[in-house]
Amino acid sequence: MKILHIKKTNWLLPFKIIEGSTVSQQPQFQGRVLVLPDTDCWFDVLDQKQNLKNIDEKIYLALVKLAELHELGWIHGDIKKEHFRKFKQELYLIDFEKTRLISSPDPITDATPRYMAPELFHGANKTVQSDLYALGIVLYEWLTQTRLQANSYHEWAVLHCQKLNVVLPSSFQVFLPLLSGLLQKQQQNRFSNVHEAINCLKMLST
């Protein structure tokens, strides 16, 4: 486990996930285990009549949380819906098992295919922009209350590289420019950092 002391904030980056029930049987982890409380998913069930301001705020806080990690010099590497958690009304980003330094990425493709940016299927390294693409998929599935479907790694590659077509419910069309910037298939056309996405969201809110 790496502990970062930056900006008076402690970030714990665990690199091994173990079952809670086995902790007592593994003395080598004594004093080095991070126990997470039971939490709710940040991106929960969404009603199309839900207040747009509340939706905007949830998206904004998720972007800010990801920006904090990037500013510390890390790529999350496995952004997915389940890793944004709500605890005591606060947002937490969890599960840093696949986190990589921005300055020294590696070519290992160990992300979840549902959320993989197109370039990762072609062997590219994970980047800030692949994190952004994954967040775009999270937001797309949340706003549409649907799940993308594929039956194999190859089908996921075809979906992300060729077939993905972003269409939002009429009540959430205001967020289409944000999702378009997050989900561009060509990396050079995607938002280059989280702050570009935040600025886009702010413009949509004015």
Residue ranges and their predicted role:
Residues 17-51:
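Conserved structural core of kinase catalytic domains
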Residues 69-86:
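Catalytic-loop of the protein kinase fold
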Residues 171-185:
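Conserved C-terminal C-lobe helix
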Residues 183-194:
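A conserved short helix/loop substructure at the end of the activation segment
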